[in-house]
Amino acid sequence: DKGFGFITPADGSKDVFVHFSAIQSNDFKTLDEGQKVEFSIENGAK
């Protein structure tokens, strides 16, 4: 709903911020709580 959220890595490391524009999908750009995803971490401006 907010256009952003956080991903919890499987290795238990610190949560990662994710903006909806970073989601690559052919459908709606949404993630559900508990959904498993693959991701690459990039450093950027806050």
From Swiss-Prot:
InterPro entries: Cold_shock_CspA, CSD, CSD_CS, CSP_DNA-bd, NA-bd_OB-fold. The lineage of its organism: Bacteria, Pseudomonadati, Pseudomonadota, Gammaproteobacteria, Enterobacterales. This is Major cold shock protein. Its main location: cytoplasm. Gene3D superfamilies: Nucleic acid-binding proteins. Induction: In response to low temperature. Keywords: Activator, Cytoplasm, DNA-binding, Stress response, Transcription, Transcription regulation. It comes from Yersinia enterocolitica. PROSITE patterns: CSD_1 (PS00352), CSD_2 (PS51857).
